[in-house]
C-alpha cells in the first residue's frame, strides 16, 4: 500500500477553538432557555424561585420522556403521531389490570402492573414500527392510523367515561412515584435525567445510535453500508413505545385516573420539544439533551403565561403551535449559515 | 457590426482579472477568459481548480471580489441569480433545473408564459416549443412530462430552454457526465448546429477526449490560476492533462501484475440472472484485476449488486473460495470478505451531512465497540490511518463530507470500504467525476491492493481505464456477458466491437 512516509509523524497543531467553531444549532435551545428564565424573572419574581422551577420541571416530565423517544424516531427519519393516544391506551390497561385484583399482594400487583405497562408500550411501538417498515406505509399515515386505533380502544375500554384506580391501598403505595422526592429532588426529575442519560448514551456511544443517524441521514447510504435499515427503524419505534410506557408509570400515580381525553395533543408537544431541541425533522442529527431543553421551554412558556397577567392561559395551545413554527425557521436559518 | 476577420472578432463575453475570495480563502486569482461568437470553449482543470466558481461568476450566480466582465466589449455587472439569462447568458447546471411534474412545454415557458387576455395561450407555447425542438433535431414530445424523459432528453430540454431564451453564451457544467456515448454524440451534433448559428458554449469537462472532439479552444485552470488558453488543434489530451496537474503524467497507470494461471479462484459466479442480467458466469483469481466494460445500461451494476447481495438474484450461484454465498445477504458477503464500492458516492456511498470519521467507520463500526459502547479514540486512530494510507487532504478534520472535493470523497469512500478488510473488492466506476491527479492515485491504490493479494473487479465506462488497469476484461451487452478479453486482445476497438454487438464469444 502507498504510505506517504513524510506524514508518519503528523504535526498535531492544536487548533484554537474560536466562537465560530460552536455549533449554533446545538447551543440555540439552551440560549432560548436562559432567555426565557430571564423573561420569567422579570415578569414575576416568584418565577425564578426553586420551588416554582422544580414544579415546572416535574410537570414537563411526561412530555420530556415521550420526546426522548421521539428523538430516536425523528432522527431515524420517521415520525410517530400516535404517542398521545398510546399514553391513554397504556394507562387505561394498566389501571384496569390493577382494578382486576388478579394479584392479592399490593406490592406484587404494582410491580406486575408496571411490567405490563412497559410490555404494552413496547408492543404498541413495535406495531407502529412493523406497519411502517414491513407494510411500507409512510410513518405519517401509519401512525395517524394507530393514533385513531389506540384512542378508539381507550374510549371503548372506558365506555366514554373515566377509568379510575379503585384500591386506596394501591393508590397510596404508588403515589410517591410522582409526588415523592429523593434527597429533596422530585422523583419525576430524577426519571427525566436517568432516561435522558441512557438515551444519550445509546444515541451517541453505541453502534445502534450511529446506525440511527446514518439511516436518518440517508437510507440508501445506510443500505449500501450493510445496515439493516428496517430493523433500525423498527427499534426506534419500540424505544418510543418504551418511553411512552415510562411516562405512563409517572402519569398514573399523579391522577390515578384516565379518560378518552388523556394525552390529547401530546404528540404535537413531543414533536415540538424535539424540533426546538435542534433535531432535524428530516432525520439525521439527533440531540437528546436539546430535546429535554425543548420540553422545559414548552412548560416554562406555559408557566410564564400563568404567572403573568397580560396573556390569557387559554392561549397556551396557540403559543406552543407558534413555537414549533419559529423553531423550524430558526433551524433553517442556522443551517444556511453553517 | 464587426467584420468576422481573424483576430478582429469582438468576444461576446470577456472576463478580465477575475478574483474571488470566500471568507479568508482565495479561490480565483486574476483569471482571464474570452468567448468568441460561435465558439466552443472548453474549461478544464483538476477538482478544486476553481472552474465551477468561475463559471458561476460568469453566469451571474456569484459576484467576483474583483475584476470585470465585458459583454460585447462593454463592461457589465451581471444581475444576481438567473436574471443574467435576460442578457443571453444561460447556465445549464449539472443537476438539472427542471420540475419533474411539468410538461416539456411548461418547462420551456416557466416564468415567462405567453398569455392572451390573462389566460395561458397553450397552443402558441406548444407550437413554439415544437419549433425549437425541431430546430435541435430532437424528437422529444412537447407534451411529455419531464419525469418520463431520459437523462439525455432532459439535457436537450435544458438546451431548448436556453435557445428559446435566445441565449448567446451557454455554460455547460459537465454535460456528458450522465450521458452514454450515443447520447453524447447527439448532444454534440446539436452543439455544432447551434455553433454554426453563432451561439457560443463554455464547456466544463473532465473527459479530455470529449474536450478534444468538441472544443475550438481550451482554457486550463490550476489552483485558481489561469494557466493557458490555446486552440485545441495545437494540443493533445496528454498535453492538457499535464497543464492541469503541472507535472508529468508518465505513469498514469501502474504496471500490471498478472496472477499465475494456477492461482486460487476466490470468486466464482455461475449462471447468474437478475433483472435483465441473464446467465452470467465468470471466475476471479487471487490478486487479479478484472475489468467489466460495456455501454451504460448493459447490466454491470445490477450484476455486481446481485453478487454482493444488495439485490436478489433469480437464478445462479456465487461462491467465495468454494463456499456458496446466500442470496440477497449483503452483510454475509461483507463478513466473508467481499466489498462493493458504489458508483454513486453522494447518493449511496457517503453521508454528506456527517463528518469524515463517522463515514469511515459506518460499515465497520463493530471494530470500534468496547464493552458495548463506541470508543472514539479507536475511531480517531482509524481515521488518521486512513488519511495517511489514502492521502485524504482536508484543511479541517471536522469538515462535513459534502463540502469535500470529489476526489477526496472518492478516497474516503475507498477507505471506508477497505475498513471492512475485504479480500474481494468490486469497484464500480472508480474515478467518476474526479480529476486526473486523483485518478492516477486511485489507479495506484488499486494496483497496490492487487499486489497485496486482494482480488479486484473494476466496473468502468472509461475504456482507457479498463485497458490500463486490468489483466482481463469482461464485456457486457444487454445483460449478457458477451466477451472475455485477455492480454493482447484488450484494446478499445476490440472492446467496442463486443459492446456494440458486432462480436460475441459463444462460450465464455
Question: Residues of each region from the PLM?
Answer:
Chain A
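Hydrophobic core segments of alpha-helical transmembrane domains in multi-pass membrane transport
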Residues: 28-41, 70, 118-121, 147-152, ...
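Inter-helical junctions in multi-pass inner-membrane proteins, predominant
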Residues: 45-55, 154-161, 203, 209, ...
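Alpha-helical transmembrane segments within multi-pass membrane transporters and channels
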Residues: 103-146, 293-294, 298
